A protein has these predicted regions:
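P-loop/Walker-type NTP enzyme "switch/lid" segment
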Residues: 1-24, 120-130
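Well-ordered beta-strand positions
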Residues: 28, 50, 106-110
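NTP-binding/hydrolysis catalytic cores, primarily Walker-type P-loop NTPases
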Residues: 123-166
Length: 166
């Protein structure tokens, strides 16, 4: 649909068609989903070559991720990476990295540090600026920027040997 608010009305049976059309046009197709495991999200995950799960240090977020990882393990899916975003809720630091790994029963592939917290992120978002291309952000947050670059390369790497449905 042209109006994103109507996206929830799209039947899951159209997702494979959308993926096939997008794969013919683009080298990389990004699909942003939400935590609820409905027909559309499950179908999108089935047809994805690689999946990036972004989690925070939030208990509800971690509980949802634990369930999703359990489903992936039960279905023998290995085509995912996990990014821990510590820069979003910088006040929520009551769980250590060890605690988070224990809760989700999985390793964390990439981490964004608390230092990557951008106070005026709305300003950049509204102007449409890509943070990884901003010189001052690159200068002050080089470690996190390099982490994101490595993650992006890992997401599009063909050597994973992980196939999505055709």
């Amino acid at each position: 649909p042209k109006d994103p608010r109507m996206g929830a009305k799209v039947s899951g049976r159209y997702i494979p068609v959308i993926f096939d059309l997008a794969k013919k046009e683009y080298d990389v197709v990004l699909v942003d989903t939400y935590h609820i495991l409905d027909e559309i999200n499950l179908t999108a995950l089935d047809y994805s070559y690689m999946t990036l799960f972004i989690i925070t240090n939030d208990i509800v977020d971690l509980k949802n991720m634990k369930s999703l990882i359990s489903i992936f393990k039960d279905t023998d899916k290995k085509n995912y990476l996990i990014l821990l975003n510590n820069s979003r809720d910088i006040g929520k630091d009551y769980l250590s990295l060890y605690d988070i790994r224990t809760i989700i029963k999985n390793n964390i592939d990439y981490t964004l540090s608390k230092n990557y917290y951008i106070k005026n992120i709305d300003k950049y978002t509204i102007s449409g600026e890509i943070l990884t291309l901003n010189n001052s952000i690159n200068l002050f947050h080089s470690k996190d920027i390099n982490n994101m670059k490595k993650m992006a390369l890992d997401l599009i790497d063909d050597s994973h040997g992980k196939e999505a449905k055709k």
